[in-house]
Structures are given as structure tokens and as C-alpha cells.
Amino acid sequence: MALSIPDAVAQYFMLLQGGVPGARWQSREQLHMTLRFIGEVNGRDTSAIDDALAGIEAPAFQLQFHGVGQFGNKQPHSLWAAARPNDRLDHLARKVDAAIHRVGQPQDAHKFTPHVTLARMRNPELDKVREWLVAHALSTSVEFTVDAFCLYSSKLTSDGSVYRVEQEYPLRGFHGEIDD
């Protein structure tokens, strides 16, 4: 489950690409924000997951990206753009995780770190990674409205993952204070 990235924000991400030799920068089609990863699913589970996700009620919200980060402290393997802290985004991620758990998937063991992966790396030059992080530390995207989340499928190819939207779920519900 993920958020699709609007074109204006994707263009901003494309401007951040470069400066790290050997980095495999994500294409426009690969850009998304994962809310919850579940791995391979059989047909019966797919239907239950679809029903559970369709029942989620959460309001639309504004989102913006600010700053960058890396996964892999000693040996960086990913560069990403960070989402500004957002209670409604966190609320949606918790709702998605709970819905998936109710249909038999294990709860996500990872802390939700709202981000969009920009590049994947193997044995990068650490100086170049640090330079890239410093150069883009204060970068900020335009703000945009998140009014849906999607169920994606992915297929690994020699050019990286190919993502496809399988289903879109509109956000709806109370627009005041957030309750869990």
C-alpha cells in the first residue's frame, strides 16, 4: 500500500538526482511512498486485503517533502526524500497496518518512516553520499493533497522494480481531530 506521487513532486525529486556515482536513481514510474509492504500474496488473501483496505475511513490531507536521508548508517544503500511530520499520514499508515493485520498478515515490525526512495546503492563513495545529503538537506517540495492511497503490485526486473496500481482507495471521513 502506498501513496502515488503527483507529477509536480516527481519533477522535484528528479531534480535531486545525481552526484552519487553508482547510484541507481528511481525512474518517475518507480516513485511512491510506501505505507505498508506485505510481500507476496495469494489470490484469496488479495480479496480479503482489498475488502479490508476499502473499509478504511481517513480524511484527505496536505503533504510536503522536506529534507533527505539514507538507510544504512555505516554502509548506505538507499537515499530518500523525507515527508514533513504529519499526524494524518501517520494515522493513515496505522489504519492500513491494522486493516492488513486483521486479515492475517503480521503487523509491520518496522517503524514507519515516511519517505520516497530516490536511489538505491551498492558500496557508494561515502564522501559523495555525505555531500549529496548536505546539498539537499533543506530541499522542499510543493505541498499537495493526498486524497487516496493505492494497492500496488511489484515485479523485480533487471532494471529495478516495476510497480503497478492494482486498486485505488479514496480517503474520506471526518476532517476534524484524529481518533484511532
Model-derived regions, located:
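Histidine-dependent nucleotide/RNA phosphoesterase domain, centered on the 2H-phosphoesterase fold
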Residues: 1-180
